[in-house]
Amino acid sequence: MKNIIRFSLSAVIFMLFANFAYSDGTKSGWELELKQLSLNITSTEVHNSSDTFTSSRLTTDSQTLIQGKLDFAANYFASKLFWSNTLFGEYGKTYLRPAGEEEIVTENANKVLLATDLTYRLWKIEDFLGGFEAGPFASIGYETQFDASNGQKLKKVVRGKAGGKLFEGKYLKQLYAAYVVEADYTYDPESTNTAFEAGFRIETDIREGVKFVCWSYYRDYMTYSEERISDLDYEVEAEARLDIKLWNNLAVGPFVNYYCAAAQRYNRVADNWYTGISLSYSTFFKKAKEL
């Protein structure tokens, strides 16, 4: 995993200092985009289940999974600056109903992220990977939750980043490497943490009405000012999905999401795979002016 960060950091630094044309920008003004508003629902209802049946469809427990997601961006394009503001939220619950027992409810997603990001539009690359822009960036964000989950305290983290980025390409929407400083207010006293982070986002039209989206990030923690059992050594998340247009801005498609984290204070790694089909809506409320 650590090699991923080293490779991404080297690639971004190379792009930033290579001999490319200076960027004058390809867009100007505000752009408001609802990237994704989606709902995933699956349900299994079993009546009179019994271990005497040989079919697993008649021995399983009734269950319902509901998950919603919002991804909104308000971006401003100037001649030498790209200012991005994002709101991301996801929340979901799983309802398990064993025969003859009380319903068990657990959360399968619970995250709210507000972030603002300022990037200097330093270079424009036109003949590599479909073209993109490159430059240094700095960002600050706040990560929390809709409610405290599973008996834990409500997560409250202020996170700042500074590094280099490739962005706004035909296919490569984002590739970055950054130094991270976190202020974690979840527990008292507050903990100041440092990390390296790398990530990317790719979007491409496979054919008319079918779009492929893939994104990922990897965060490698280095120091903590307060030692806690919940401290992470690293975390990584990745998602890939197909958006198949049904009608206007409404789409349906399969997706797979992977999340993995390693504990720093003890030798344990846990991961989560989530696959399914989602119904999603996306649109531009306002598009930036093309130059």
Per-segment meaning from a language model:
Residues 42-67, 97-104:
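Surface-exposed strand-loop-strand hairpins of Gram-negative outer-membrane beta-barrel proteins
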Residues 36-47, 78, 89-95, 140-146, ...:
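Transmembrane beta-strands of outer-membrane beta-barrel pores
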Residues 172-247:
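Outer-membrane beta-barrel transmembrane domain signature
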